[in-house]
Amino acid sequence: MKEKAAQHRLLADENTSHRLVSASRQLVKQFPIVHIASWQDGSWLGLDDAALLMSCGEAGLVLVAFDRATLPWHAGQVVRAGESHGGLVLFRRTVRSTDYGYQSRLLTGFWVDEGHAWDWLNRIVYLPKAP
């Protein structure tokens, strides 16, 4: 299924489940998220982290992921190289990768309350946010 670019702001990476996308859209009708496998016919699947981050920047997409080990490092490398990325939302270790309900509540709550209005260029946010 091909997705339209204008309606999306968030891109779920290949290590997140399609269930996160579905659960988010059940909570918030037309929530602006798409899974990478559906985005541009899956052409971004398998891109290395730096290329994916820069592609998200060019497309105006914020990447949603679990990869706390390498994505922040790659985002820093992109910025140090004088390039930009579209932003990154990472789930903290306390968020189980199979708890799609909790993930979707965190993401939709954050996005609706504040994230949608932010300038996401080169920004990284961890959910849940620290108190």
Residue ranges and their predicted role:
Residues D49, C56-V78:
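Acidic, metal-binding active-site segment of PIN/NYN-like and related structure-specific nucleases
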Residues E3-K4, R9-E14, H18-Q40, A50, ...:
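Acidic, PIN/NYN-like endoribonuclease modules and their adjacent C-terminal/linker elements
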Residues M1-E3, M54-S55:
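Short, conserved, surface-exposed binding loops centered on an aromatic residue
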Residues L45-L47:
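Active-site metal-coordination segments of metallo-dependent hydrolases
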Residues S55-G60, T108-V112:
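A general structural signal for short secondary-structure boundary/capping elements
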